């Protein structure tokens, strides 16, 4: 993948807290943000004393190149947002313009932190389904706006392999959202949960206090029954349906 094929879009710490139900006691946990892109989550979580590593293919490039790509693509992103405001749940006086401003602010915060954070090892180039980390490196892995959302581009097999890989490096995984780009519940969701159950993992769908895209207000929480227990894909049981 080349940089000119990527449309960078970043979210802020408040978004991550709400999407993944992150609390103050999570500051003590070792976090992995998978597919974070130009989000300010790492910068602000780290500034507050938290421990987090962000992983994304875009981190192959320096700040100047990423910043130039954001400058080139963000006007079109905003234009599309204004062209289809019905996709967004805008309440309490919020507007598409205000939402776009939040995204822009988050990306500028990322760019200011990225050089220092990169040298500190907080930003690592890479992506699913093969992670460059040792087993049990993290306590919690979060992944936003990648799995399930792009079900037309990422196969069921990719989803299953990616989540099992996240479970290899972290005892718990949280994924948001569970809808596709059209706003419907992803067709991959229950087959993925079945595969995870067969592999020995537990999963639960959690309603969160966050809904920017209509219908996108659920997170999938996946965890190993015991942090030291390996997850091995098998082929027998039906998944538990937990809500």
Regions found by a protein language model. Give the residues of each.
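Class I SAM-dependent methyltransferase Rossmann-like catalytic core
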Residues: 1-28, 63-65
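Conserved beta-strand signature within the Rossmann-like core of class I S-adenosyl-L-methionine
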Residues: 170-179
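A short, conserved alpha-helix within the catalytic core of class I
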Residues: 150-165
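Class I S-adenosyl-L-methionine
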Residues: 181-227
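Conserved class I S-adenosyl-L-methionine
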Residues: 26-37, 45, 52-56
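A short SAM/SAH-binding and catalytic strip from SAM-dependent methyltransferases
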Residues: 139-154
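A short acidic, Gly/Pro-enriched loop at the edge of an enzyme's catalytic core
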Residues: 129-141
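Class I S-adenosyl-L-methionine-dependent methyltransferase module
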Residues: 47-121
């Amino acid at each position: 993948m080349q940089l000119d094929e990527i449309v960078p879009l970043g979210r802020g710490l408040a978004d991550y807290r709400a999407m993944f139900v992150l609390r103050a006691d999570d500051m003590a946990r070792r976090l992995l943000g998978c597919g974070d892109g130009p989000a300010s989550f790492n910068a602000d979580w780290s500034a507050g004393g938290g421990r987090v590593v962000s992983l994304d293919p875009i981190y192959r490039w320096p700040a100047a190149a990423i910043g130039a790509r954001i400058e080139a693509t963000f006007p079109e992103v905003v234009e599309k947002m204004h062209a289809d405001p019905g996709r967004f749940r805008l309440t309490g006086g919020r507007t598409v313009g205000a939402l776009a401003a939040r995204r822009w602010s988050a990306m500028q915060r990322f760019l200011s932190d990225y050089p220092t954070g990169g040298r500190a090892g907080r930003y690592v180039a890479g992506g699913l389904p093969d992670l460059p980390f040792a087993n049990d490196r993290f306590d919690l892995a979060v992944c936003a706006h990648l799995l399930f959302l792009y079900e037309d581009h990422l196969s069921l097999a990719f989803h299953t392999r990616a989540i099992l890989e996240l479970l290899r490096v972290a005892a718990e995984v949280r994924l948001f959202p569970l809808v596709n780009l059209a706003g419907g519940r992803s067709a991959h969701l229950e087959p993925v949960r079945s595969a995870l159950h067969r592999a020995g993992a537990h999963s639960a769908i959690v309603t969160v206090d966050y809904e920017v895209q209509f219908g996108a207000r659920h997170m999938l929480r996946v965890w190993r029954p015991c942090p030291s227990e390996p997850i091995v894909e098998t082929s027998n049981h039906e998944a538990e349906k937990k809500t």
